[in-house]
Amino acid sequence: MAPKATKAEKKIVYDGKLCQLLDEYTQILVVNADNVGSKQLQNIRQGLRGDSVVLMGKNTMMKRSVRIHAEKTGNQAFLNLIPLLIGNVGLIFTKGYLKEVSEEVAKYKVGAPACVGLVAPIDVVVPPGNTGLDPSQTSFFQVLNIPTKINKGTVEIITPVELIKKGDKVGSSEAALLAKLGIRPFSYGLVVLSVYDNGSVFKPEVLDLTEDDLLEKFAIGVSQCYFSDTSHFIPNPSAAPHVFINAYKNVLAVAVATEYSFPQADEVKEYLKDPSKFAAVAAAAAPAADSGAAPAAAAKAEKEEEPAEESDDEMGFGLFDE
């Protein structure tokens, strides 16, 4: 019989495995493993087999291995993992699509009863309806102030009742009632907390972004760049025309207010000194615009004066002539 490995030997083996995975994989899901049983974890490993590896361990061991491996390889990006190793967490190394792996992990959540002393991860609401319990069980409902009535020899809950609030500890009465009603209000499984991809770390919500979401955010970014560039006079293809027009207006305003001038400004100054000149120019432009409409109107009138062509009947070629 082979001798049992010592603690130090186990640490060496674990360190070697973690370092090997860090070298092989560039994508890692950091997952929370609270209330996940060994059988459930085994099922998850089997479901991910092929392109993903699940590694659990103590945070201190994982942090130590990551830090030493970053120093050995010179890859400081690995250090971004260390702040994520808090609480009961594990690592899923994968070469697959991160969204698909995350969805596969979520499939293995299982229902769990409300055990005494457990902190509720969600609000627990008992729905109205027939409980199937006989009237002798009404004491459970009375203790919890749940309104009931007896209907056809069984206890019926009249209205929905919020039995446990998220973050509260499950009491003995709540646990007993939920067990009698056959309600397993909680579900547990590996929950993705963070995503590590080639040194970058982001929240798992990013995996749910669609192409439409990205296009919308890109459009918002372009518009923000446009307004920023026009206000700071930074030229780019979308902002350049507006930057130059605004600059021209500013120069023109300076020329009008000072002795400095240039040909375009001289014309504006003349109009400001004698507004009647501007009126004359506007009046001259109006007939020019009307002149284009005059030939069209004449052509229309000429067309109306043309005699209508004679019909076949008027020329003696009726349809039923013999």
UniProtKB/Swiss-Prot annotation:
Q: Which GO terms describe its biological process?
A: cytoplasmic translation; ribosomal large subunit assembly
InterPro entries (alphabetical): Ribosomal_protein_uL10, Ribosomal_uL10, Ribosomal_uL10-like_insert, Ribosomal_uL10-like_insert_sf, Ribosomal_uL10-like_sf, uL10_eukaryotes
> In what way is this protein post-translationally modified?
Phosphorylated.
Q: Name one Pfam family in it.
A: Ribosomal_L10
The ranges of region (Disordered) come to 294-322
Q: Where is there biased composition of kind Acidic residues? A: 304-322
Q: Please provide, in alphabetical order, the Gene Ontology terms of the cellular component aspect for this entry.
A: cytosolic large ribosomal subunit
GO function terms (MF aspect): large ribosomal subunit rRNA binding; structural constituent of ribosome
Q: Which UniProt keywords apply?
A: Phosphoprotein, Ribonucleoprotein, Ribosomal protein
Summary of subunit composition and partner proteins: P0 forms a pentameric complex by interaction with dimers of P1 and P2.
PANTHER family from the UniProt entry: 60S ACIDIC RIBOSOMAL PROTEIN P0 (PTHR45699), LARGE RIBOSOMAL SUBUNIT PROTEIN UL10 (PTHR45699:SF3)
Q: Which family does it belong to?
A: Belongs to the universal ribosomal protein uL10 family.
What is this protein's function per UniProt?
Answer: Ribosomal protein P0 is the functional equivalent of E.coli protein L10.
Q: What is this protein called?
A: Large ribosomal subunit protein uL10
Traced from the root, the source organism's taxonomic lineage reads: Eukaryota, Viridiplantae, Streptophyta, Embryophyta, Tracheophyta
